[in-house]
Each structure stands twice: as structure tokens, then as C-alpha cells.
Amino acid sequence: MTDTLASLAYLAGKPTAQAKIKAKPEHFQVREDLGFEFTGSGEHLMVRIRKTGENTSFVANELAKACGVKSKDVSWAGLKDRHAVTEQWLSVHLPKAETPDFSAFLAQYPSIEILATARHNKKLRPGDLVGNDFVVTLSEVSDVDDVLKRLETVAKLGVPNYFGNQRFGNNGNNLQEAKRWGRDNVRSRNQNQRSLYLSAARSWIFNLIVSARLEQSLFDKVLLGDILFKGDEQLLVSAENHADLQSQYDAGDLVISGALAGDNALPTQDDALALEQVFLDAEPDLMALIRGNRMRHDRRAIALKPANLSWQVDGNNIILTFSLDAGSFATSIIRELVQEIAFEREF
């Protein structure tokens, strides 16, 4: 598979150590955190599943059959990796109060477990989660000491908050199609397809902006005209507050943001605007798609700092534990630590 991110900069240089990722399903464990409680009643049956070596859409389709409903009646907050052991909630539109008998379903699919059920008054929609907890094993690590040094840097500074390869499709196909749609002014009623390509377009431009800040040693430097996050508040950097905001950033109180391009003007100014505008101008096909669909500009943190990061060494394996907010990619953490060893999976 092509690494769409291969040309993007690293925080501490490209890793020299190599390791296998997802050598076994249990080497990549994910637990979803919705961040809210269920109402206890309502038309939607919430089903907590643990799946091993299966993708979310397949499990959802099979669960729909087990419940006697259509596939469109089962939804989720986020798609989870196939080559992994993952826990997440699925919602089933099932107005009747009875919970189906899942025994035949579970007997048919030993790779799927049902951990809990509950009732709720709303269906799950994509994005209805606050984050995910991860336990990731890097196996057959070629240079454990180098990875441990890099982990210390990650704990202190975080990593570039890149959108991962998953966002761009197999071999970057979603990104290439996004460029074609923009170039040829393609119009489609397929909302899912359009959403995939728009997401790939904005994500790629954002990645280029973050990479440029790294290459220009501006990843941790506040620029004139930057938009900074302070909790839910956004602050514009001016000549008057520049020094003060840099100090607050250095103290860990502020976060530098990058552009998620839209059809409206960038809100950044001065040096930050000049830096970001270059990459919007460099991708006319992607911008044509974004503007043609009237996407509105948004902002995203350029640095990803994993919460609750810890690690332990087991021979030449390193086991990582961390939590990420929704929309962040565990692969962005791994990318800063090791180069992935290609191998044939047996699952």
C-alpha cells in the first residue's frame, strides 16, 4: 500500500527503528468513549460490541440481520480498524422494547462479542464520541532505545496532528478522485462518496500546512496572524499580543491551529496567512471541489498530544497506552516512533 504521507515532515526526523504494527489483532486495541450516558429508554437499542479482525460496517450489517432490520437502521459513532481488537457502540432502530436473542448471531461469529445493551432516545451519528483509548504493541522493534527517546519527545511536544492514510483511501485513491472531481467539476448525488472526497481534500491541504511549519521550524513558533486555541476560545495573534501569546503557548496554555480550507476567506492574517495561502493556491483542483460544495472554513490543532501516554518494554516489544480525542489518528503517533515492517498478515 502506498504511504500518502511519505513526503510529509517529521517532528524529530524520520525514525531509524523498524517494527511490526498489528502483528496480531490484540496488538492494536481500541476502546471507544462516547462521553455521554444513555437515557435508558427510547426507540434505539444500543449494543456494545467487541470485534476481532472485522470491520465496523460488516458487523453492523450482520447485526441488522440478527435484529431483523435493514442495514440503514444500524449506525455508529466511528469506524474502527479491522486488523485490531476494538470496542464500540452500535445503535439499532428497534422501537419494540424487546431485546433480540443474539445467541445464533454470536455462535455464527465467534470474532464478535456483545458486551452490553441499553436503550436510548437517539441514534448514533458519525462523530458522536469524545475519543478513543488505545493499547498498541510495537513488535520486533529493531532499536528499542531510539524509540524510547522518541517517546520522551512525544510526551513533551506531541506529534504533528496529521490526518492518517485512512483518510485518503487505498493508495490515496480518495485524494486522487477528489482532485479529478474538482478538475472536471463532477456533480454527484452520492452523499457518502462526496463526503469522502471533500474530507480527503481538506485533510490533505491541512497536512501540507503542518508539514511546512515543521520544515520551516515554525511548529512551536507563534506567528503574527496565527489563530490560537485557548479552550473553546480562538485568539488572533497581533503585534501587540505576540510576545505574551508566545509565552502562554510555551507554558502549555495555548494551541496553534491550521486551516481546514473552505470557500470563505482564511481568518489568519499577516505571516500566518501568507504561509497557509500558499497551499490553498497550490491545490486548485482540491479548492475547486471545496468551493463548489460550499464547505466552510474551520481550524484544527497542528499538534497532537496524546493523553495518559505510558509505555512498557517487553523484550523487543514496546506496549503503548494512550488516549486520543475524536478525529485524531493513532498512526500519527506511531509514524514518529518507527518505520513499519511490511509483512503478510494471517488475519
From Swiss-Prot:
Its EC number is 5.4.99.27. CDD domains: PseudoU_synth_EcTruD (cd02575). The active site is at 81 (nucleophile). Transmembrane segments: none annotated. The keyword tRNA processing applies. It is an enzyme of class 5 (isomerase). One of its GO terms (cellular component) is cytosol. It comes from the Bacteria. GO terms for biological process: tRNA pseudouridine synthesis. It catalyses: uridine(13) in tRNA = pseudouridine(13) in tRNA. Belongs to the pseudouridine synthase TruD family. PANTHER family: TRNA PSEUDOURIDINE SYNTHASE D (PTHR47811:SF1). Responsible for synthesis of pseudouridine from uracil-13 in transfer RNAs. This is tRNA pseudouridine synthase D. It comes from Vibrio vulnificus (strain YJ016). The gene is truD.
